[in-house]
Amino acid sequence: MPSPQRRGQGQWALGHLEPLNAAERFKKDDAGLNVRDRIVNRYAYLGFDSIDPADLRGRFRWWGLYTQRRPGIEGGRTGALEDAEIEDSYFMMRVRIPGGQLSSDQLRTVADIAKEYGRDLADITDRQNVQYHWIRIEDVPDIWARLEEVGLSSIQACGDVPRNILGCPVAGLDDGEILDATAVLRATEAVAANNPEFGNLPRKFKTAISGCASHCTAHEVNDISFVGVLGPDGTPGFDLWVGGGLSTNPMIAQRLGVFVRPDQVPAVWAGVAGLFRDYGYRRLRSRR
């Protein structure tokens, strides 16, 4: 008798395109980044109650937006309630800060937005993002415009996409660093962010690029990390680590034992991210 066919895990490259879970279904129906036009031209005018549920609980994340939990609902109760019972009409907005570095103009803008729209509060996260709370959908277009005037954005700060790239916050200033990875990080950010090629991954994809000697980016728990090292001939470059993560299925990244030149980093990053996109498990979101 022929052996029973094993059920696929949703790997695109192996032809396992069905069945779709709810997250894969809304991503197939419309790309997450497309929701910006609806936010600016429809929802900001018509208000919270006009928002399509698939946008609200799915695609909004591609632009760094999550609904806040209603006051008085503890985290332990959320599994027993419907989404509509949990959601408040305010949003958390996450702003992407590549490498965790801000100019003085950018920092002033971040602070001004917090004062005007976020009840004088902004979080600095452990992945070098900034988060606002108490954001109304009506105010999102203006916040975006003000962020973009100083070169900031909430694009792909959440969702199944390449997340903000971690870097050493004192890159270029640390006397003990192996190399200043700022230019490499920015070149990789240009490939990763707002790129339709990587706009639909199986899950979030976390990156760290650092040339400092103290390993401040915790490279062991990122999906891909480039760690500053000296090559065999003493030339500065990067050691490559892949497959790390925390959350419900924590694991330590594996060192691949290859030396990556600074100019190779964006292409290597794209190759690894492409493997995750095409071979990552999409059927069960708890599997990696």
Which residues are covered by each model-predicted region?
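Short, flexible, solvent-exposed loop/turn segments with mixed acidic/basic and small polar residues
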Residues: L81-E87, G118-I124, D278-R283
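Short amphipathic beta-strand starts and helix->beta connectors
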Residues: I73-L81, R108, D112-R119, V242, ...
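Low-complexity, intrinsically disordered regulatory regions of RNA-binding proteins
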Residues: P4-Q68, I73-E74, T182, G199
